[in-house]
A protein has these predicted regions:
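Active-site-proximal segments of metal-dependent phosphoesterases and phosphodiesterases across multiple
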Residues: 175-177, 191-250
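N-terminal active-site segment of His-dependent metallophosphoesterases
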Residues: 22-94
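Acidic/histidine-rich helix-loop elements
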Residues: 43-63, 85-88, 119-145, 171-174, ...
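Extended active-site neighborhood of metal-dependent phosphoesterases/phosphodiesterases
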Residues: 90-194, 235-242, 258-287, 294-305, ...
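Active-site-proximal beta-strand elements of phosphoester/diester hydrolases
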Residues: 40-53, 159-169, 199-203, 277-284, ...
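Gram-positive cell-envelope targeting signals
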Residues: 1-26
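A short C-terminal boundary segment appended to hydrolase-like catalytic domains
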Residues: 37, 292-293, 297-339
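Active-site neighborhood of phospho(di)ester-bond hydrolases with catalytic His/Asp-centered motifs
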Residues: 45-47, 78-83, 109-115, 165, ...
């Protein structure tokens, strides 16, 4: 069924690309790196899959997993950037696990926790941080094939460090404990010594980034909420900016792709840089974007080279590149070497 759907979408998108390529930069070319000879790391990122027990949502994710599995050059990793489930329930995690297990989307799979994943309730209908940790670590371990025993952890792929942050509360905004903040600083210090870019994965972006708080609003949450890290945001931002070539990859706010020239139109950019710190915000995979490029089934493919990082917008569900929303980011380590 997925093959049939993909075939139909491929035909439709081929026609669409001819009509709209000059407007949106749609390109239905090979799913492969720009330069296969020199690329060091390639990974797909998606956020906000919001799994329920719906087979329709499972089918939507299958479109993307199929696209990744059939990439001309196998991906080094697929990274889930939180809100993997809608409420952190066992049946939601089970469906997600079983859906992912049908495919081999990448050589590695990694997963961050999001606020929706922390809304697990006990038998009395009360929020349960204990069950949040139990369910997330269990299913993240089973889905990724890694031994994950905390809401935050570090992984390494092709010699590149991935640092995953996780909220330790059940609120919409994140709570990053002092212990986790200290751990983050230590992990960044170790990783920065390698002279390679470091990827910090957090469902929540930094307060004030990517158009926040104007691009965020949650009337159901009684707690003050900025759409970002919350009260610890400034401290986390300062730590991230202590080191060179740090890439923060987030989701959460369900904003669509924007290109470098569209900040004045939409009030935010999908990729923001300050010095050698770079913040990448992903659209929601499952839901239609609330602003920017209106679509779903999308995410960024990250390609790492010796001298740069390419951030490439892709519709995984339609197997199409959205080249208008691509970014190229030079690495400071390469610049230093060139001098």
């Amino acid at each position: 069924m997925i093959v049939v759907i993909k075939t139909i979408l491929s035909v439709l998108m081929s026609v669409t690309c001819v009509v709209t390529s000059g407007i949106f930069g749609n390109y239905a070319g090979d799913f492969s790196p720009v330069d296969e000879e020199t690329v060091k790391l390639t990974f797909a990122t998606i956020s906000d899959t919001h799994f329920t027990n719906s087979k329709i949502r499972a089918a939507m994710l299958e479109l993307g997993l199929y696209d990744m599995e059939h990439a001309e050059t196998p991906l080094d990793a697929l990274v889930f950037v939180g809100d993997n489930t809608d409420h952190g329930y066992i049946e939601q995690y089970e469906l997600l696990k079983n859906t992912v297990a049908k495919y081999t989307p990448a050589k590695n799979i990694l997963m961050a926790v999001g606020n929706h994943d922390t809304w697990t309730e006990d038998e009395n209908g009360e929020d349960s941080p204990e069950l949040v940790k139990e369910y997330f670590t269990k299913y993240a371990s089973e889905i990724t094939g890694r031994n994950i025993d905390e809401l935050y952890y570090t992984a390494e792929i092709n010699g590149y460090t991935f640092i995953f942050l996780g909220s330790e509360s059940t609120h919409t905004s994140a709570y990053i404990s002092p212990a986790q903040i200290e751990w983050l600083d230590n992990e960044l210090s170790k990783a920065a010594g390698k002279g390679k870019p470091v990827f910090v994965i957090s469902h929540w972006p930094i307060n004030g980034s990517h158009g926040l708080p104007g691009t965020w609003g949650d009337e159901k949450d009684p707690e003050p909420d900025t759409g970002g890290f919350g009260e610890q945001s400034d401290e986390i931002e300062a730590i991230l900016k202590k080191y060179d070539d740090i890439f923060l990859i987030s989701g959460h706010i369900h904003s669509g792709f924007t290109s470098p020239g569209q900040e004045s139109v939409f009030g935010y950019l999908s990729v923001e840089s300050e010095g050698t710190f770079h913040s990448i915000n992903l659209p929601s995979y499952m839901y239609m974007s609330q602003r920017g490029r209106v679509s779903n089934g999308t995410g960024y493919v990250i390609e790492v080279y010796d001298d740069k990082v390419l951030v490439r917008a892709r519709s995984y569900s339609a197997s199409v590149w959205y080249t208008l929303y691509d970014y190229e980011i030079p690495l400071s380590t390469a610049q230093t070497t060139c001098e």
